[in-house]
Amino acid sequence: MKRLDFVFFDAGGGHRSAANALKAVIEEQGRPWEIRLVNLQEILDPLDIFRKYTGIRMQDIYNVMLQKGWTLGSAQMTVLMHGLLRLYHGGQVRLLKEFWKQGERDLVVSLVPNFNRALRDSLPATPLVTILTDLADYPPHFWIERQNQYLICGTGRAVEQALALGHPSEHIFGTSGMILRPTFYQPVTADRAAERRRLGLDPELPTGLVLFGGQGSSVMPEIARRVTARAQFIFICGRNKKLADRLRGMDTRFPKYVEEFTSEIPYYMHLSDFFIGKPGPGSISEAIAMHLPVMVERNAWTLPQERYNTEWILEKKLGVVLKSFREIDAGLRELLDASNFVRFRANAVAITNRAVFEIPDKLELLMQR
């Protein structure tokens, strides 16, 4: 039996989600593999200077920043973080080597950025493959390092970046997109009109799904306050009950439904006509998989590793990119213009993303080499 480690952390929800989705598909396929999910944060906790001085893990600080929208200057913060990672590289390698002593693995699968050099140096004799959970790399030293390893890339842009850094083509595997949970490939049969009525919505109004990750975002009430366009909205607030209560208590010009944490995102997307959120690779890919045109913003507060995603949306003609959600009404007029909407939706329908089902075959191939 082959033994694989899937390495993730919880700085943002996409890394754990991708690891779990891939593991679920592999188990469903009945492959004779033993998969261990490895939380990198737990291994490196002794080196976490934020935890040492504040009692709060670095990944938790990052998640609070996302929730509060404190992302201005994040590009400069990334440079600072990379400096700290270089400073503590030796300690990271030491802790990882101790962890690997628990048993040899046939393949280490990294679903995290920033730490791939430490992963490579800590286990040099074992094949390492990094699966990019972003549409593209944010060089230098983010996803793609100059080292002997394999890479799985969900876009042509990421493949080009890997080749430009000198990785041989036989070490690079392209897929048709980002890893999505298997539930996004299962049909949703609920009657849209009936379900909208059940939620207190108008069955005929254009319906937007507003989603900003597992903790919501402070921009969601601003969106609710500013909208005057002929539309209605489903707000998903995640584990942020305070935000959900605030939205429920708002007087809005449109019908709305507010949900807290839910695993039924495909259901709510089935009830929706378009998506509004941050340009995260997971949310965008989920919306496109459900054939929803998207609306996002790009400005100085946008995370640097997510800025390319807005270019991808415009390049593929999948929706509207705003400078700020203060322009939400103008953005909705553009998105919901009849000819624009038909084109955006047709382009979304034309994209077929089967990455989560493609990757197991690529991992099998790597272990046969």
Segments (PLM) and residue ranges:
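Donor-nucleotide binding loops and adjacent catalytic segments primarily
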Residues: A193-R197, L201-L271
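Acidic donor-binding loop of glycosyltransferase active sites
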Residues: P255, H270-S283
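Active-site and donor-binding regions of nucleotide-sugar-utilizing enzymes
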Residues: K68-G166
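A short, well-ordered alpha-helix in the C-terminal region of glycosyltransferases
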Residues: N340-R354
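Conserved N-terminal ligand/cofactor-binding loop architecture of enzyme catalytic domains
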Residues: A21-F99
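Short hydrophobic beta-strand element within catalytic cores of glycosyltransferases
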Residues: F275-G277, P293-L303
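C-terminal alpha-helical cap of glycosyltransferases
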Residues: N353-R369
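A nucleotide-sugar donor-handling region in carbohydrate enzymes
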Residues: Q149-T207, F212
